[in-house]
Amino acid sequence: MSSIIRYDWTAEELHALFDLSLPELLYRAASVHRQHFDPAEIQVSTLLSVKTGGCPEDCSYCPQAQRYDTGVTAQKLMDVDAVVAKARQAKLAGASRFCMGAAWRSPKDRDIPKIAAMIREVKALGLETCATLGMLNTCQAQALKDAGLDYYNHNVDTSPDFYDSVIHTRQYQDRLDTLAHVRDVGLKTCCGGIVGMGETRQHRVGLLLTLATLPAHPDSVPVNLLVQVAGTPLHGTQTLDPFEFVRMIAVARITMPRSMVRLSAGRESMSDELQLLCFMAGANSIFYGEKLLTTANPETERDQALFQRLGLRPMHLMENVSNQDQHHGNVHADIACKHVV
């Protein structure tokens, strides 16, 4: 199957891919994957919540929203030294990228210097850096870029026409605007969504269509399977057919051939066999470690054992060529900002 990079995918084309027999879809996705990546290599990231709970948003899936009774206690922003210690542990465990997440609607300018210090110190360990802090303006994005940040994560979560069923405190366009600010300053983007929230296949097509028709495909595409947390509105939602999740991975791989497709939240509930199908469908990145923000993740030892059983190995740092360097028309903006770092 052709792996030409396209930005003009249509909903009809994506529906046709989803409708293929699963063996045929896996074959096509694997063919595209092998044109750009070594199928035996998996990029390994670790995610740390550097500021937990107390978020003012109402995302129906999120245990960190302060309006839901989920048992998550709001905590202050971690000290830089504590974050660096966690990053050292992640590197020793085999991670090549360290992601720092904060439960904010958007960071305040006064928070940026401390986040920037975290980025600089983690970067000095030889790790790639990623942050997910909520909505950013262009000046904040530039400050993070100047500190050495490699990736910024900001998910669109779902399709535009299902979004209002899940979130009311932030508009879909707000998410697209943050992605534009991140691209404008030259940061690599990490952007995906969540499935299993009660959406239909049409909505899953809409999510991938949004990502695959952005001005530049995200460098990383995290595909999250809803982790149902008691106290959140989506607790009790009917679980997604595992084969539908595999189809989601495969269509993401076909439509965004050079992106890292990441198994993210929900992997704790996946069998080894399901994870193998996802790797065969083109997933080539995982979050590694015992916890993703506030929800469980497979233990490091389990992942290491699975890699050994499947003959997989961690991808070395910087083996993935940045999509930002490959995409046409990605012009970095000239920005005049007050000095916040």
Curated annotation (Swiss-Prot):
Pathway annotation from the record: Cofactor biosynthesis; biotin biosynthesis; biotin from 7,8-diaminononanoate: step 2/2
Binding site for [4Fe-4S] cluster: C55, C59, C62
UniProt keyword annotations, A-Z: 2Fe-2S, 4Fe-4S, Biotin biosynthesis, Iron, Iron-sulfur, Metal-binding, S-adenosyl-L-methionine, Transferase
GO biological process: biotin biosynthetic process
Catalysed reactions, semicolon-separated: (4R,5S)-dethiobiotin + (sulfur carrier)-SH + 2 reduced [2Fe-2S]-[ferredoxin] + 2 S-adenosyl-L-methionine = (sulfur carrier)-H + biotin + 2 5'-deoxyadenosine + 2 L-methionine + 2 oxidized [2Fe-2S]-[ferredoxin]
Lineage: superkingdom: Bacteria
Domain Radical SAM core span(s) in chain numbering: 40-267
Cofactor dependency: [4Fe-4S] cluster; [2Fe-2S] cluster
GO molecular function, one term: iron ion binding
SUPFAM superfamilies named in the record: Radical SAM enzymes
A Pfam short name: Radical_SAM
Cofactor note: Binds 1 [4Fe-4S] cluster. The cluster is coordinated with 3 cysteines and an exchangeable S-adenosyl-L-methionine.
Keyword Lipid metabolism: no
InterPro entries in UniProt: Aldolase_TIM (IPR013785), BATS_dom (IPR010722), Biotin_synth/BioAB (IPR002684), Biotin_synthase (IPR024177), Elp3/MiaA/NifB-like_rSAM (IPR006638), rSAM (IPR007197)
Gene3D superfamilies noted in UniProt: Aldolase class I (3.20.20.70)
EC number: 2.8.1.6
Protein residues bound to [2Fe-2S] cluster: C99, C130, C190, R262
Family matches, as CDD domains: Radical_SAM
Similarity field: Belongs to the radical SAM superfamily. Biotin synthase family.
Protein name stated in the entry: Biotin synthase
Organism: Xylella fastidiosa (strain 9a5c)
